[in-house]
Every structure is written in C-alpha cells, then in structure tokens.
Amino acid sequence: MIMAISLSVVLVGIAVPASGSPDTNLASGGKPPGGWIVDPSVYQSIFGGVGVGAPQGTVVADSGFRPYPHGFPMPNWGTNLDFAQNALVYGMPTRVTLEQLDGDKYQSPAPLNALSLRRSLGNGVCRDPRSIDPKTGKCDLILGAELLAQMIETGAQGGHCFGLAAAAAALYNGQLPANQVGASGLGINAANPMGDPAIQTITRLFGAQFLAPDLLPAAVAGQSPTELVETLKRTLPGGTVPFVLTVFGESGGHAITPYAVLDRGNGLYDIAVYDNNFPFRALAVTVDTNTDSFLYTSAVNPNSASYTWSTANKSTIALVDIDDVLAQQPCPVCRGKDQGTLLAFSSFPSANAEEITIVLLTPEGQPLASDLYRTLQPLNPPTESQQSAPLIFVDPGVDFLVGVAAGKLAASQPIEVYALSNGASSYLLLDEVTSDSTIVFGVGEDAATFQSTKASSPRIQQLYDGRTTSYDVNGHPLLLPKEVKVNQDWDRSAKKVRYSSSAKRTLTWNVQVTGVRDSGEASWVALRVPVPAAAEILVDYSRASATTAPLAWVVAKDKTRTPMRMQRVTDSLVDQYRDQLYAVQGPS
C-alpha cells in the first residue's frame, strides 16, 4: 500500500540522469523525456537509489531497454483505492487530494471498452460487427463481453503486473503504437500520463492470462533456469524484449520484464529486470547454472513484506512470448461453439484467504471428476489487502455446482462468481459471506440455483446473447433463510423465467428482465414482491418491448395466478433504488 508512505514524500536528491546525458547503467539510459509530471525525487524518497538491488556482473546480452525511460512512471496497482493512492503520490492521471481520498471522491479507472475487447478477442464481442464505428473502433457489446470485462477488472484487484510487464516490452519493441499506450513516443514511457489509453492496454494485456489457453499452464509449469538464461543471451542482443518473465510459487505469481543478462562468474548470472512494483529501478533475478536454480525477491512496495521465489522453495520460472500475449485470444463468451466454462471469482481479503475453500460438485452434490476441469492461479502475488482467487476451466457440456466454504473470517467478505461460456453466462453476487458457512451456486445451460447454510441475500444473473438480441434475467431473494434453496429456471425459447424456492414462509423478491438490441435497451423490474411458501414468480417477456411490460404473476401452489406489476427501469428509478437494480452487466 502506498498510502502509508505518501505523506513522507519530500524533495531530496534526484537520482535520474540530467536531460541529454546518456547513462549506460542498467536502470536508466538515453535521453529523459520532457514534460515530467512527477518530481524525480519522489522515486528516490520511496524506492531508494537506482543502485539498490541492481544486477551485478559483466553484461553479456542487452536489449537496450531500461526501466527508465521505457518503464511506466508509477507502480503496479490492484484495487481502485490503490490507483487513487498512486494518483495522490504521483499525480497521474490527475492529482487526487487527501480529502478526496478520505471521502472516496476520486475517479476510478474505466472498465475495458469495446475497442480494447476487440483488440484482444476480435469482432465477435460486438452485437453487430457491421455497426463498428470506423473512427473510434467502438461497437455495442454483447452482454457476455461486458460481464467478461467486469470479471477481468475484478481479477486484477490483486495487481496488474502481467499487463504492465507486457505493455512496457511491446511498446519498446514497436509492437504497440505509442498512442495505444499513451506514451510520449515510440518506446519512451517515463512521462506517460497514465490516462485511459495506458489503463486500457495494461488491463487487456493483463487479461490475456485468463484467455490464452496455454499461457498460465506453461508459466506455472516453468522451465529450466539455465535454459532460460541461454534463451535470453541468444535473443536480447537483437534489440527487443521478446518475453515476459514469470515466477510462480506458494505465495502466488509475478510478472516482470527481462532486458539484459550479466555474467557474475563461476556459473552465476543476473537477469536484469524491470519490476513494475519498483518504477525506474533495475532489479535482478539470479540464476546458478551449476545447480540449475534461481532466486528472486520482490514486494508489493518497499514498505511491505517481501516475497521470495526460488528453486529451493519449489517455485518455477518461465518466459512468456510477447507475441502470444498480443495475439487475438479465443473468446469464451462470443456466440458460437461451446468451448466450456471459464469460472472466476472476485479476489479475497488477505485476512480471509486461508479460510476460504472452493470446490466443484456434480448437480447431485458429489465431487466433480478432476479430469473435467483444471484449476490455475493468476500471476498475482497477494497484497496487503487482497489475494487473487483461482481460475477454473470446466469442459464443454458439464453442468456443475460451485461450493464455497468459509471458516473463521477476519474481515468483511463479499464474493462474486463468474461462470462464462459461449453465448450464455451466469453471475452471482453475495454482499456478505458469513463465517462458518457454505454456499452452493449451480451453473447450467438454462438454470441457476443457490443455497447457503446461513441466511443470505444472493443476486443471481443469467445472460444470453442471441443473433440479434441479448437477454439478461436477474433474481434477488431478500433475506433468504439458511438452507433454503433458490431456483431460477429460464426457458429461452418460450421467453419465460420462473423464480422459486424451498422456503416454508413468505419471501420477498426483486426480479428484473432486460432485452438489448441494436435499436436500444429495455429493462423491466418488479421490486419487493411477496411470494408465499410453495409459490413462484413467472415472468413472460415474449411480447415485451420498450413500451410494453412483460407479463408477470405470483403463481400459488394450487396454480392460482396473481398478476404483478413490472415497471420500466429509468434513471429516476435507478437513483431511487440504486442498491436493488442491476446494470446491464450486474450490480458490482
């Protein structure tokens, strides 16, 4: 966390070279860019001199990249609060005052937009690719793409290290144009104002680890440290940085930018790296070719606890090809052949991380066969506040339950569950997970279920992107008693949704149905609907439009129907019931 040290920043000695004077050390080199936003003394005060932790030995391979001026001018961030704390210290993209920070009155980074999603996933994220704006590259997104963007943003709460490492290298290599990253010139990044172009590119490249099917498995499996050094010795003299370097261990993973190799003698080598937690500083990964081992120590920031990755503690090290990161990735939500389900979760408060267990079950409640899914950990080390949750890839055609068991929780614990698949996705938001509880969320092609061992208030969303129209149905039982099972059954061909539960007393529900097409969007909601025991809600939206509400009833056990009113979601209604209505991609 930067906040703890922000008020101690003072003007002290400058540690970057004067304008026009080249510096051949491994931290900085070339001409400094003009237009400094941050006084260079800030970096000296926070991160120490450029020689702290620097590589040692004789340079035997050098790409020419330097953390200054080719790295980003502010450190890695995770949550919106982290980003605002960076803005307080570094003034980027706009200065945040302490009063604004304390009052939560600051601008958070925008989620991935249509242009960024198209660059990563292709035009299938657009509802109608023919409607792409030729000037801006934007389009109306399918609902699944909006939910995917939200998932990537949620997954990055542990940090954007992979995106920062890849973007800095790709910019230096000329693989990304400067205006796509917001830099002042080709490869010159030190004066980057860190506006929306930088945020969009960093975030979408961070998301590549969720989307490229072989990226995380290869990074986690690792490779021989000795062979890795030989690869860098062979490729870096070409004047580009072809790889992101990843380390992975029990504490999680990290991604950094390798740009030079130094020979320390006696079989020891230092790999000079730009670690995006330490702007403008050269750090070293040490490799012992005698034992084919490595060692690297880093931290979220200089004031936080450090993490060590090494062969001794069974960590792995790998190179990820920048070309693979920049390539168009398979789209897990675009309309087309079922590629399986990408299951993702919001990050956990670090204080709770050891108390939360995630399992997959069959619809009958038995453990799901392990050959039907694979689990991977994103390349994010835990921060002082957040720890990333795993990613789970489930084979096509598999219906399953997600079980989340909580032990003794030390902090407030909301949870989001994303189940993303081609054309149809599901989402669960639980504002508060209770200690010593278990929740179960069922994911199927046309049904969703929920149950908890403690009282709760789940919000369940199902999405479907058709050829011309996208639909979004939501159910929110308020004050759901423990052990009560909730069902949300969606007959998409008949355009009907049934909301039911096993409750033995009256429950109160919010239900919402949204239709989106190129001509516009219409959303209808019924709020605080009382539903007696054994009754259900039936919504028929087959004839609904922007001006015609869906038909809706509370259907009693004896099949008696009581009509219920659904009202159009308007700006004024959103203002009045902001905490109870869904945006298109969910309530987050």
Residue ranges of predicted features:
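Conserved active-site-adjacent core of cysteine acyl-enzyme catalytic domains
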Residues: A167-G253, D263-N266, N276-F278
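Sec/Tat signal peptide C-region and signal peptidase I cleavage site
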Residues: V16-S19
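Bacterial N-terminal signal peptides
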Residues: I2-G13
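Short linear interaction motifs
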Residues: C139-I152, T226-V229, L236-T246, R335-Q339
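Active-site-adjacent structural segments surrounding the nucleophilic cysteine of cysteine proteases
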Residues: S21-A191
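Extracellular structured ligand-interaction cores
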Residues: A156-F162, T240-P242, G253-I256, L268-D270, ...
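Active-site signature of cysteine proteases
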Residues: G249-V320
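Extracellular glycoprotein-like low-complexity segments
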Residues: D324-S588
